[in-house]
Amino acid sequence: MELPEVGDEARSFGPFQNGESAYFSSVNRGKKSITIDLRTHRGGDIVRQLLKDCDVIVENFRPGSMDRFGLGYDQLSHSHPHLVYASISGFGQTGPYANRPGLDQIAQGMGGHMSVTGPPGSGPWRSGTAISDLSA
């Protein structure tokens, strides 16, 4: 599922082949994409409609976001007892960093990867490839 109006950020990553991001195409091969605004009632209704044909939800928002959208496990499991619901986030569901965003460059920095990339003496450099995202 992609963000309304802007889509997946990876669609803008070069290089491009036939007008499409080579990176986006490679990591999303064989997938179908939809756009739903979860912040709206209509978006929630669409997700609930899709659940009629789904067994699994995997979401990677910060903890509590899906509850605010009315789509948390407790809100959906009563009407969909078969549902497997996986919540993943950069820093887990609990703990002091739980509500922080989990982006690739943050994982690279906190994991120490940025300290060993780039020219000597330059300070931390982000890897050109989303290495934390791809290795997760």
Q: Which sequence ranges carry the predicted segments?
A:
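N-terminal helix-loop segment corresponding to the beta1-alpha1 unit
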Residues: 1-135
